[in-house]
Structure formats: structure tokens, C-alpha cells
Amino acid sequence: GGTELGRLVRAMLLGDGPVPTSRAEALLFAADRAQHTDEVVEPTLRAGRHVVTDRSYGSTLAYQGHGRGQSVEQLMALVDFATAGILPDLIVLLDVPLDMADVRLGGERDRLESEAAEFGQRVRDGFFQLAGADPDRWVIVDGVGDVDDVAARVWETYEGWR
């Protein structure tokens, strides 16, 4: 998270400490999202500026919903509460095959990144289902290639969107 509380919550959730239940995990991530919305997103939007962030509600739906088997509908209600209804106008989903993502992660992995391959596949499938269900908000960009190529594709996508 981009807040002090968010950093603490994420360290607790993704570190070596006690493993939360699936529902507790979703609630803790929602607390992080609520704090981030209140401290970062809402004030930035109120100031008339854009917000660019690396995670959004799609992560909750993909990881806790599709990955953990929690109700996507219930999670969306939780997201709506946590974000006070403030959702992104554009979500860029970088399409990277799981084996390539695994190589890019290298040796340092958090608890979620260390899950079994089946979990990763469910999460990936979940992201694509979300993108397919809301094509006005989600754009899929090829994430294969070096960082400059991928960044150029993301920028081109943004330019075409705005």
C-alpha cells in the first residue's frame, strides 16, 4: 500500500507471520484499500490530478475471489465500501504467461507469489474474466518484452484511451 497502515497490513499479509483465513485476508486487504483511498486517491482526485497505481480492486476479485474461492459478488460489495465507490476509469492488465512471470519474480517471493501454480492460474484466469466482463474499463496489453517495449505499449494504450 501507499500508506503507513497499508505497508504494515501488506507486511503482515505477505510475510512469514500467521496465515490468515481467506475471509480475513480479504478483509485485511480491504482495510489497506480503504486507507489508500482515503489518504491518497480521494485527496489526489479532489485536487484535480490523476492517480496511477499498481493494484486496484481487480486484485481483490482475482486473488481472493477467483484464487481463494470467495464470492466475487460479496468481495465487490466490500470493494465498494472500502473505496467509497471510487473505482479506476482505466485498468491496464499486463498479459504475461505464468512461466515468464515466474522467471521475472526471481527468488524473492511473498506468500501469495509462493502459492501453487494452480492458484496462479486461477488468479490469471480471474483477471481475464474481469477484463472480458468490463471492456470499457479494462484494457489488456501484451506484457512480453523488455521494460521499454512494454512501457511503450502501455503508454500507447493510454493515449488511445484518453
Language model region names:
Residues 48-49, 88, 135-138:
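A generic structural signal for alpha->beta connector loops
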Residues 1-83, 153:
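ATP-dependent small-molecule kinase phosphotransfer cores
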Residues 32, 56, 96, 145-146:
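Short beta->alpha linker loops
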Residues 59-126:
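A glycine- and Lys/Arg-enriched "phosphate-lid" helix/loop adjacent to the NTP-binding pocket
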